[in-house]
Amino acid sequence: MKMKWLISVIILFVFIFPQNLVFAGEDKNEGVKVVRDNFGVPHLYAKNKKDLYEAYGYVMAKDRLFQLEMFRRGNEGTVSEIFGEDYLSKDEQSRRDGYSNKEIKKMIDGLDRQPRELIAKFAEGISRYVNEALKDPDDKLSKEFHEYQFLPQKWTSTDVVRVYMVSMTYLWIITRELKNAEILAKLEHEYGTEVSRKMFDDLVWKNDPSAPTSIVSEGKPKRESSSQSLQKLSSAVIKASEKVGKERENFVQSSEELGLPLKIGSNAAIVGSEKSATGNALLFSGPQVGFVAPGFLYEVGLHAPGFDMEGSGFIGYPFIMFGANNHFALSATAGYGNVTDIFEEKLNTKNSSQYLYKGKWRDMEKRKESFTVKGDNGEKKTVEKIYYRTVHGPVISRDETNKVAYSKYVSFRGTEAQSMSAYMKANWAKNLKEFENAASEYTMSLNWYYADKKGDIAYYHVGRYPVRNNKIDERIPTPGTGEYEWKGFIPFKENPHVINPKNGYVVNWNNKPSKEWVNGEYSYYWGEDNRVQQYINGMEARGKVTLEDINEINYTASFAQLRANLFKPLLIDVLDKNKSTNGNYTYLIEKLEEWNNLKEDENKDGYYDAGIAAFFDEWWNNLHDKLFMDELGDFYGITKEITDHRYGASLAYKNISKESTNYKWVNVDQEKIIMESTNEVLAKLQSEKGLKAEKWRMPIKTMTFGEKSLIGIPHGYGSMTPIIEMNRGSENHYIEMTPKGPSGFNITPPGQIGFVKKDGTISDHYDDQLVMFAEWKFKPYLFNKKDIYKAATNVSALNMSK
C-alpha cells in the first residue's frame, strides 16, 4: 500500500487551492472569529475562554443541533415523547439508572469555578443558536425537526452533563455479572458443581498472564483461575439475567436507531523520542464509536490567550479528546476496568420494598417518574412508573416470588461532572504534571495518552476502582446483606501507568493495561489471543517509526483477519507434518504463507484480493464449532460470544495449542481436529467454486455511514455509498509534536456539518470526507493560524455581547 504519496497528495491539494479565495462571509466586527476551513471545520479565535466556550457551543449547535437534541433526550428519558411507545422501554431504563436534574445540578455546583463557568457558557452557546433557530425555523432548523414536528429546547449545564452521560456512562453501566452467573448456574445444573466450575474458570478466567499488555513488564503473575470462593446465589439469578438481558437488547436497538453511540472501543499509540525516526514524540488516535451520518465526533479548533487546541471530541462534549494543544498531544481509549458490581439483595417476605442490610430491614428509596408518550394518532398520554434504589444503587430486577432483587453499584456514581471537569483540565494542562493531576480526578475507566514537545510520552489507566472484599468472586453478583461491601478505592498512583517506557512506545486496543491488572466479569476480553497484537507486531517489526509507519500499522490492523495471528502458524505447522499424504496441503501452505492476513480489495473489484482468506474464514468457523459445539451442546449459544469474541479467541487457542486448561475440552488429538476442519472446508470450496484459491475469492463486506436516519428511517442524504468494511477508528488523528508545535494529518468522516435544510439539501461538508476515508487519504492537521487561514473558505465573527 502506497500510503506516503496519498498523504502527501491530499495535503498538498488542500494547502494550494484555497489560498486565493475571497471570504464572502468575512465580518470585520469584533467578537469571536469563526474560521471555517475547506472541510467546514470551525477554528475559533476569542479574547477570553468564556467567549470561546460559548462560541464552541454555538457552532456545534449550528452544525449538529438535531443530533445534540437526540443525545440529550436519550439520557433524559424523553425520547418516547417524540417518537412514541416503541421507545418507552429505553426511556424507562434511562430514568431508572439515571439522575434527576436536581442531582446533576448538585454535581455541577461542586466543581471548581472555571470548569463550572465554562460548561455554563458552552450551554449558553447552544441556547444562543436555539433562539436564532426558533426565530427563523424554516432556514435554521434542520429537516428532522420539521419532519417529526417538534422544537428544540434551550440548554443548561445540566443538559451538557446529560449528553456526556448518554455516551460515556453507558459503557460502564453493565450487567455482565448476571450473565456469568446464569452461565454458571446452567452449567452446574447440567454437569454438577465440580466440573462446571472448571468449565467456568476456563470460560471466564480471572487473570491470563499470557495476555498482551500496554505496559511491558518482566515476569509473569500467577495464573488465577480458581473459583473456590464463589459465593452462593439465589436460583432467581437465571430469570433476572434473562430479563435484564432482554431489556438491554431493546435498549441497544432503540439507542442505535436514535444514533446514540454504544459501541465504544478504540485504539491508540504513542511513540517517544527514542523510538521516533524524527526524535519527536508521536501520537495516533482511533476512537471506535460506530459509523453513522452525522458522525459521533466533532472536530474544532479552540484559541484564546494562553490556550490553543485542535482536535475532536464526542458530540456535545465541551472538550477535545483526540488532538493537541501547544504543549502535548492527547488521546484516549475505553479502559474496560471493573467499576460496576451487581448486588443480590435479600427482600423481606412480608414487605418486598425492604431489603436486609447489616442485620436490619431497610426501606428502599422509592420514586415515581412520569413519561409523556406520543401515541400512534399523535395524541400524547402520561405513563407513570415506580423505581427503587438500595444503598448499592438502582434496582434493575425484582423477583417477588423468590424475594430477591438485584441492584447496580457503580464506583463513579455521582462523579460524572467531576470527570467532565477533569477532561477540561487535561485540555488546559501545559505539562505532564498538570496532565497527571487531571488524570487523577477522572473517575470512569479509560486509558489516557500523552506525548509532548520534549519527546516524553505517558500512559494512564484512569478511573476509580473499588477495593473489593477478598471473600467474594467479582465475576458474579455479590451478596448485598452488608458483609461484603467495598473497602474503598485503589489510590490513583497504584493504577497502571508508565512514563517513557523502555521499549519507547505504548499501544492499546482496549487490551489489558498491565500483567497484574484484572477486569472481573469481562476478564475474557483480556486473553492470550488479543487484537492489540496487530499493533505490537507492527511496532516490533520496525526500528524507528514515523507517522506514515503508524498509519501502515493501522491499515494492517483495520483489515486483518484477527484469528490469523496465532491460528495460521498452527495450521501451517500441522499441514506441513501431513503434506506427504495429500498434495493439496502443500498448495495450502504456499497460499497461506503468501497471504498477508488481510481482507482487502486493492483492485476495487468488489472481492477480497486473497482467495485463501475465504478458506481461512471457513476453516476457523469449522474448527471453533468442533472445539466447543459438541462439548457445550445447548450452552454453545450463550458461550460463543466468549469463545469467539471480537477481541480474541484465547480459550480456543489454549485448547488447540495444547496449553493447560482446567477442563478437558478436547478428547481427541488436536491435530486431528485441525485436519478434519481442513479437509471438510477444502472439499466444500473445491466442489462449489473450483480447485484453486483464485476461484474461492469472496465478495467484500461493506458498510455505510448512515444508511438510516437517526430514528431508523431510510434517507437519501448522500451517505449511503457503501465502502469496504474496516475494523478502524471512527476518526483517525496522526500527530507529531515538533519543537514548533503539533503537525500531522487526520480524517473525521463522513463530514463536519450534519445540518440538513428543510427541503433536504445537505452541506458540501456533510460527507466530503467519506471517500477519502475509504481510500485512506487524509487532510492536514491544522493548528497554527497561518495554515488555518490558508485553508479558510469563510471567516465570520460572533458578537458574544448580544
From Swiss-Prot:
Q: Which Gene3D superfamilies match?
A: 1.10.1400.10, 1.10.287.150, 2.30.120.10, Glutamine Phosphoribosylpyrophosphate, subunit 1, domain 1 (3.60.20.10), Penicillin Amidohydrolase, domain 1 (1.10.439.10)
Q: Where does Ca(2+) bind?
A: E177, D341
Q: Where is it chiefly localized?
A: secreted
Keyword terms: Antibiotic resistance, Calcium, Hydrolase, Metal-binding, Secreted, Signal, Zymogen
Q: Which Gene Ontology CC terms are recorded?
A: extracellular region
Propeptide positions: the record gives 235-265
State the Gene Ontology BP annotations: antibiotic biosynthetic process; response to antibiotic
What are the boundaries of the signal sequence? 1-26
What class does this enzyme belong to in the EC scheme? hydrolase
| The protein's Enzyme Commission number | 3.5.1.11
| Cofactor(s) of this protein | Ca(2+)
Catalyzed chemical reaction(s): a penicillin + H2O = 6-aminopenicillanate + a carboxylate
Transmembrane helix in keyword set: no
Q: Where is the active site?
A: S266
Enumerate the subcellular locations listed in this protein's record, separating them with semicolons: Secreted
Annotated cofactor note: Binds 1 Ca(2+) ion per subunit.
Q: Which GO terms describe its molecular function?
A: metal ion binding; penicillin amidase activity
Q: How does it assemble?
A: Heterodimer of an alpha subunit and a beta subunit processed from the same precursor.
* Entry similarity comment: Belongs to the peptidase S45 family.
Q: What is this protein called?
A: Penicillin G acylase
Which species is this UniProt entry from? Rhizobium viscosum (Arthrobacter viscosus)
